[in-house]
């Protein structure tokens, strides 16, 4: 325990040195520390001022706080879209709770609320996709088209038979790669014809981005984490999240330069060996 304010430079510096000492005892080369934004900013300043002392220290911003702040970004973008009224009138949340979760004040409730809205929109989107395939698509054979439509309908229907639902979902996943181009074409055409479809399709993309980031944190997927963070940064900038856009963007740029440096170094070594 360190008897001091967690946001003081001396406390942050002592914490970083203690972690380094622990890594030396364990004979590990690098030490990884995760902070929230307020402490992360001070830790990075210390590392920038003492680059040689903390060259083997990796400072990460906490994924929970990034996700929580991104929830507030989503709420700000779609604050007048009717999502709050939808959550209240459907009886899912009360007035005060719905208002707070859209401001990013509650992580679990916020993720659940956006998951529910996302699920409802995806069901409507798949129904519209099925109708579009029946009305306009002539590229698929009739038999194959009917199979795809029946699988979509099976997955949409509520069923207590878990085995049949898993079977239908598995068959649908097998055919999804072939449907992907058609679905992208459908979304493009529908977005051009309807601004409302384009608006809610953007909501689907943003919530899926949040879910990808959460999945990366839970699974420890570094590539998915980098991809999700890279797509999050423009939203932080657009919604005036100055500190998050600055420090998350800076961290991402440093990681990219590090990977480029490592690739160039490997190429130089292989060239010398040849």
Give each language-model segment a name.
Residues 1-274:
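Long, low-complexity intrinsically disordered regions enriched in Ser/Thr/Asp/Glu with frequent Gly/Pro
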């Amino acid at each position: 325990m360190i008897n001091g304010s967690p946001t003081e430079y001396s406390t942050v510096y002592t914490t970083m040195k203690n972690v380094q000492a622990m890594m030396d005892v364990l004979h590990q080369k690098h030490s990884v520390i995760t902070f929230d934004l307020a402490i992360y900013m001070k830790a990075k300043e210390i590392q920038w001022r003492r680059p040689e002392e903390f060259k083997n220290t990796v400072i990460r911003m906490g994924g929970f706080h990034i996700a929580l702040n991104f929830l507030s970004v989503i709420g700000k973008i779609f604050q007048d879209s009717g999502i709050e009224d939808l959550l209240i009138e459907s009886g899912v949340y009360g007035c005060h709770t719905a208002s707070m979760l859209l401001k990013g004040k509650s992580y679990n409730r916020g993720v659940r609320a956006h998951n529910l809205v996302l699920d409802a929109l995806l069901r409507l989107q798949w129904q519209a996709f099925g109708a579009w395939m029946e009305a306009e698509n002539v590229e698929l054979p009739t038999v194959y088209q009917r199979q795809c439509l029946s699988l979509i309908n099976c997955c949409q229907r509520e069923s207590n038979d878990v085995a049949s639902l898993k079977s239908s979902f598995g068959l649908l996943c097998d055919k999804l790669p072939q449907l992907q181009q058609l679905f992208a074409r459908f979304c493009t055409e529908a977005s051009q014809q309807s601004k409302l479809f384009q608006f809610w399709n953007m909501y689907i993309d943003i919530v899926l981005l949040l879910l990808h980031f959460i999945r990366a944190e839970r699974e420890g997927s570094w590539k998915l984490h980098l991809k999700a963070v890279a797509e999050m940064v423009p939203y932080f900038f657009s919604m005036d999240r100055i500190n998050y856009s600055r420090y998350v963007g800076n961290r991402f740029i440093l990681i990219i330069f590090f990977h480029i440096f490592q690739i160039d170094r490997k190429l130089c070594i292989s060239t010398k060996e040849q």
